[in-house]
Every structure is written in structure tokens, then in C-alpha cells.
């Protein structure tokens, strides 16, 4: 099993912790990660774009001129697509961009991304993040103690409310619970800081 250093809040090492190879020892699959990111980004699209076709544009109910005898091309409505102010042909309509991937493929993508973080030494496990009260400065000090200055995904349990409140105002930190870990926020952040209890929950879900 892969092992990584276990740290305290003050940055000192507190032994090591074993990582489940079924989650953190997977050979990274870039194609699966790419597909999973595309799927999640597609699901974030609003899809509310719309234009008016010739049936939705106001006016145009009267034939602009008679069918024959004017020398001009025959027309049935001034809201036909060829007219200024006419309806749009084949324009976008409201739709959902969501599509599905098999559950095992989605899990493999997250496992691949997490395994890559471990290989890059960008996976930091903390014994606990205990705060008496929500203090952004105190959490920033903890990040400094851990030598983490990059854009970071902080994973804490539901019980670590003060830690979550302390970190949420930091520009370079994104705070989630184990249930909120997804392929997009794992890949989008350079480092992951996770508590030991949150690590157990992540392994329980993905293993």
C-alpha cells in the first residue's frame, strides 16, 4: 500500500498514513479523466439560449404584395428568414447538455485524478483541523505551516464546521466534504489538503 506523511496543524510530521491502493494506487487514465471533465462541464451549462423562428416573431401575418404582376419575387410574409427582422432558421433552442457516463468510468476518473495527485506529491494528509472558532487568519497560518501556497482543495468532514468556515474566505482554497469531491475540483486545484477522517470517508465511497 502507498503511504504518505501525516502532518499536524503546526506543520510537524506525525507519522505516516496508508492509502488504499484501490483508490490512490490506480494507474492514471487521461482519456477517462478527459471524458469525465467534459461530462461535468456540460452538465453545468444552463442551456437557456433561444432565438425566435418565423412562427415566434411578431407580425408578418399579411402577404406583403400580391402573388403575380409586380415583377418582384413572390413572398408570403415579411417575417420570412430572408427579410430583416425575420425569423431565425435552425437557431439554438433551450436544451439540456447533460449526458451520462457509466458509474465505474466516473469512479475510475476520480481515482485516476487522486492517484496522480499522490504521484505528484500534491496530496497532503492532516491529522485534524481543529479551530475553536472560525478564523480565516488561523487557517491561512495552517496552510503556511503545511507549505501550501497553490490553489488548494480542502476536504473536511461535516463535523469540521469551524475549519470549513475558516477556509471558505481564502481566495486559493475550495472547501468540500468527502461527498463533494468530484473530478472537476480535483483536477482544477494544484494540491489537496485532507483530514484523516475525511480520507477514510473518501476511501469508503470509492474503494
Curated annotation (Swiss-Prot):
Keywords annotated in UniProt: Ribonucleoprotein, Ribosomal protein, RNA-binding, rRNA-binding
The UniProt record lists the keyword Ribosomal protein: yes
GO biological process per UniProt: translation
Listed InterPro entries: Ribosomal_uL4, Ribosomal_uL4-like, Ribosomal_uL4_dom_sf
Domain of life of the organism encoding this protein: Bacteria
Region (Disordered): 48-87
Pfam families assigned: Ribosomal_L4 (PF00573)
Listed GO CC annotations: ribonucleoprotein complex; ribosome
Alphabetized GO MF terms: rRNA binding; structural constituent of ribosome
Family: Belongs to the universal ribosomal protein uL4 family.
Function: One of the primary rRNA binding proteins, this protein initially binds near the 5'-end of the 23S rRNA. It is important during the early stages of 50S assembly. It makes multiple contacts with different domains of the 23S rRNA in the assembled 50S subunit and ribosome. Forms part of the polypeptide exit tunnel.
Subunit field text: Part of the 50S ribosomal subunit.
Protein name from the UniProt record: Large ribosomal subunit protein uL4
Protein's organism: Limosilactobacillus reuteri (strain DSM 20016)
Lineage: Bacteria, Bacillati, Bacillota, Bacilli, Lactobacillales
Gene designation per UniProt: rplD
Amino acid at each position: 500500500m502507498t503511504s504518505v506523511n501525516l502532518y499536524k496543524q503546526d506543520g510537524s510530521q506525525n507519522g505516516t498514513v496508508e492509502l488504499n491502493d484501490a483508490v490512490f494506487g490506480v494507474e492514471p487514465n487521461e482519456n477517462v479523466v478527459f471524458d469525465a471533465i467534459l461530462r461535468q462541464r456540460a452538465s453545468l451549462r444552463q442551456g437557456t439560449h433561444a432565438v425566435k423562428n418565423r412562427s415566434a416573431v411578431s407580425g408578418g401575418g399579411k402577404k406583403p404584395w400580391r402573388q403575380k404582376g409586380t415583377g418582384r419575387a413572390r413572398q408570403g410574409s415579411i417575417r420570412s428568414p430572408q427579410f430583416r427582422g425575420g425569423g431565425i432558421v435552425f437557431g439554438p433552442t433551450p436544451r439540456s447538455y447533460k449526458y451520462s457516463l457509466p458509474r465505474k468510468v466516473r469512479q475510475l476518473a476520480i481515482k485516476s485524478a487522486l492517484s496522480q495527485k499522490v504521484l505528484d506529491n500534491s496530496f497532503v494528509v492532516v491529522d485534524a483541523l481543529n479551530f475553536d472558532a472560525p478564523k480565516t487568519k488561523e487557517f491561512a497560518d495552517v496552510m503556511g505551516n503545511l507549505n501550501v501556497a497553490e490553489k488548494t482543495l480542502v476536504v473536511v468532514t461535516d463535523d469540521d464546521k469551524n475549519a470549513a468556515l475558516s477556509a471558505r474566505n481564502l481566495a486559493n482554497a475550495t472547501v468540500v466534504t468527502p461527498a463533494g469531491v468530484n473530478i472537476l475540483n480535483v483536477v482544477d486545484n494544484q494540491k489537496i489538503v485532507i483530514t484523516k477522517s475525511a480520507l477514510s470517508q473518501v476511501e469508503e465511497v470509492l474503494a
